[in-house]
Design a protein with these regions (language model features):
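Membrane-interface helix/loop caps of multi-pass membrane proteins
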Residues: 2-394, 413, 423-427, 433
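Extracellular/periplasmic envelope-modification machinery, especially enzymes
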Residues: 279, 350-354, 368, 376, ...
Length: 735
């Protein structure tokens, strides 16, 4: 969000602090309204955060520029020039109180509302949010920020707070270092003491970094957009654009009509860009110039630098200074902090992925009320700290305040218990205690998750028949299902633990050797993670029947002749290249059989699985060179709001946590219809082991079927070994 408390005049770069920009408070009010409304109802990025970042840079850089200019005279002390602690302490005092309160609230509700399967990951996010690296945490997790649902993190929105905090600290240190260098030079050469020279050096430094950041954002946009969305380096150009305007405010006088027109167009762009720009897919690359540029225009058009003599602010600027918008801007920081977790917890409690207009209105109303209380009784008292109260606006022209925490200049001077030293001290102590408690809980959650053990290889098959319950009618005793939802997320194939699967960006072909590694007979397991999951069975069967299993695996990449897309919507060029090279490698290695998936799940609103066109092309290439293939039908994919283990951990029944058979699977194996066309292929189908006539539940035969949304748990695959063993014997005749 955007840092400003009793901000300096818009003409800060010139040293004029005679006015207070209420219109920019109102702009913050509009921006936070857009952010909250789009989050609650529309599942889109509004561009409001980009407005906040631009305003942040404008005010913060203006404040730092004033500091650098003020420390150039020889009479100024070196301590004042380069000591970062006073300003850093202001940042801490203004940013942390409200954030810590929200995180403490979030920690409590995680324990009350969220399934235990999510406590470990959410504990990591609590830590990341409190320590201001949440954006990097999410970047490496590559979470989709497009829409809110009950499976989202209640701290996902804090990426912008983390990014902005990093910007503040980096910019502060760089500004003080540059100021110290210029001061050292100015003591020897008077030229470096001139304000115009100082502004020029600062401006060109900002411009250089901003251009590099903008270029990086556009370059990375085409490579890994989900990561780039949260990348601080890719985002830096947005606040730096505001900072450049603070340094180089154009003093071009315009007519009132032209200023009104520019302001109206800019405001219209800010309000509407969320509808016609897919922010998640496009920001912070070139399309982010729309909200950022529009914000710069509103700052500039409302500045006295653009007004002709005897003309006041543009009408749009006066409209933005409406008291209600200014008030909304004054609570924008707290409102940003509160609205998202309230939305996420409500949807988790109700087990839904969207809210009605009535529900959304209630959530926003509660958010506004809590934000106002937080601003008045937590944020404002601690922001004022022990500083002397002064009656002039200039007392708070630092510009390095907490995001969107602007209050009217004299508000903290009003009498009230919340402004007493005793209240501030007690509040600070309470927040510290809560923070330590929440932090300890987060660390405990993470430690417990890391230390959780998974040992299901020796389950009694009489108690845990798994797929044999549906396939063979094996009895199912009443025992606790295994693995526990808390640990099933680690129930992966051995190849994942051995790292014998190429990642998204890894172009290499990693060949693993399993089963009887010294055998001459070979089955090659080839494809993506849905082929990989069968290694659990093939490894065991290979050891007992003397054949080797070689693996050629890549995340998200079944063998294909066409470009496929990653789950976040970008072309997966590496998959196509990898597939071609693996096909060439298989022609050289010549395994006795290739084992791979033969179908794909339905897309979007479609029902039933299918055999894609590019699968058939791969099958034809195998047929034409005489390669024998065992094609296994893909398993059903769950479609619930939560991962099946999370759904189970929340106390819901296995049927509720699964998927309709008619939705996930075609009535018969669509690949089996290709038998005449591909006589080199054998087709396996274990749908009847995973689903009854109507439903594919999350628990089958006392075993959790999925370890996430759609990958089979290794324990469940292990329960299918007898069936797979019999089918492989028929296909190969090896034993």
């Amino acid at each position: 969000m955007t840092p400003v408390v009793a901000t300096p005049n818009e003409d800060a770069a010139t040293g004029n602090t005679s006015g207070y920009r209420l219109d920019l408070d109102g702009l913050r009010g509009i921006a936070i309204a857009l952010v909250a409304v789009f989050h609650v109802w529309f599942g889109r990025v509004s561009g409001g955060v980009d407005v906040f970042l631009t305003l942040s840079g404008y005010f913060f850089v203006a404040s730092l520029l004033k500091h650098v200019l003020a420390t150039q005279p020889a009479s100024a002390s070196w301590g004042r020039a380069i000591n970062p602690w006073p300003r850093f302490w202001r940042l801490v005092r203004r940013l942390l109180p409200a954030l810590l309160l929200v995180l403490a609230f979030t920690a409590a509700l995680i324990a009350l509302v969220m399934p235990t399967t999510r406590w470990g990951p959410l504990g990591a996010e609590l830590q990341a949010s409190a320590l201001y690296y949440q954006n990097w945490h999410l970047a490496f997790e590559s979470q989709d920020y497009a829409a809110a649902d009950s499976a989202n993190s209640p701290m996902q929105h804090l990426w912008s707070m983390s990014m902005q905090g990093q910007f503040f600290v980096l910019t502060l240190l760089c500004a003080l270092a540059l100021g110290g260098l210029l001061r050292a030079l100015s003591l020897k050469v008077e030229f470096f003491r001139r304000p115009r020279v100082v502004r020029g050096i600062v401006g060109f430094a900002l411009l250089g970094v901003a251009l590099v950041s903008f270029a990086w954002a556009n370059y990375r946009h085409g490579i890994n957009q989900p990561f780039t969305y949260y990348d601080t380096v890719a985002r830096l150009w947005e606040p730096l654009a505001g900072g450049l305007l603070a340094v180089w405010m154009p003093k071009l006088a315009l007519s009132a009509r032209l200023r009104n027109l520019l302001s109206l167009v800019a405001l219209g762009l800010i309000i509407t860009c969320g509808w016609w720009i897919a922010g998640v897919q496009e920001y912070p690359a070139a399309w982010a110039l729309v909200p950022v540029g529009a914000t710069l225009i509103l700052i500039w058009a409302g500045s006295p630098a653009t007004a002709r003599p005897a003309e006041g602010q543009a009408r749009v600027s006066r409209g933005l200074a409406h008291p209600q918008l200014v008030w909304l801007g004054s609570i924008a920081y707290a409102l940003y902090l509160w609205h998202w977790p309230l939305l996420i917890f409500y949807m988790a409690w109700r087990y839904q992925d969207e809210v009605s207009w009535l529900e959304g209105t209630g959530i926003l109303g509660v958010s506004v009320l809590i934000a106002w209380l937080t601003t008045k009784y937590v944020e404002a008292p601690l922001r004022s700290g022990s500083l002397r109260r002064k009656k002039t606006v200039a007392r708070t022209t630092d510009g390095d305040a907490a995001p969107d925490t602007t209050i009217k200049p004299t508000q903290t001077d009003k009498p009230g218990f919340q402004n007493s030293r005793g209240y501030r001290g007690a509040l600070l102590a309470i927040l510290l205690v809560i923070s330590v408690a929440a932090g300890s809980a987060a660390v405990t959650w993470q430690r417990d998750a890391a230390n959780a053990t998974l040992d299901t290889e020796n389950l009694d098959p009489r108690l845990y028949p798994g797929g044999r319950a549906f396939l063979n009618g094996a009895p199912v005793p009443k025992v606790t299902a295994q693995p526990s939802p808390d640990v099933v997320g680690m129930d992966w194939p051995i190849t994942s633990y051995d790292s014998i699967i190429s990642g998204w960006k890894d172009p290499s072909i990693k060949v693993g050797y399993y089963g009887d590694v010294d055998a001459t007979r070979t089955i090659a397991l080839v494809g993506g993670s849905h082929a990989e999951q069968w290694i659990t069975a093939l490894n065991d069967i290979g050891k007992r029947h003397n054949f080797r299993v070689t693996t050629y695996l890549k995340v998200g990449c079944a063998l294909t002749t066409e470009h496929v897309f990653t789950w976040f919507g970008q072309k997966y060029y590496q998959c196509n290249d990898w597939s071609n090279r693996v096909m060439e490698r298989l022609a050289v290695d010549k395994p006795d059989y290739v084992f791979t998936t033969s179908t794909r799940p339905p897309q979007g609103s479609e029902k039933g699985d299918n055999v894609p066109k590019d699968y058939k092309e791969i099958f034809a290439r195998f047929r034409d060179r005489g390669q024998k293939v065992i094609g296994i039908r893909d398993n059903p994919w769950s479609t619930g709001k939560l991962k099946p283990p999370e759904c189970l951990a929340s106390g819901r029944k296995p049927e509720v946590c699964g998927v309709s058979r008619a939705q996930a699977m075609a009535p018969t194996d669509p690949a089996a219809a290709l038998a005449d066309e591909f006589p080199n292929m054998t087709f396996l189908d274990y749908t009847d082991a995973m689903c009854d006539d109507t439903y594919c539940p999350a628990v089958v035969g006392n075993i959790l079927m999925w370890h996430d949304y759609h990958h089979l748990s290794a324990t469940f695959v292990r329960s299918l070994i007898p069936a797979i063993e019999a089918d492989l014997q028929k296909a190969t005749g090896w034993w």
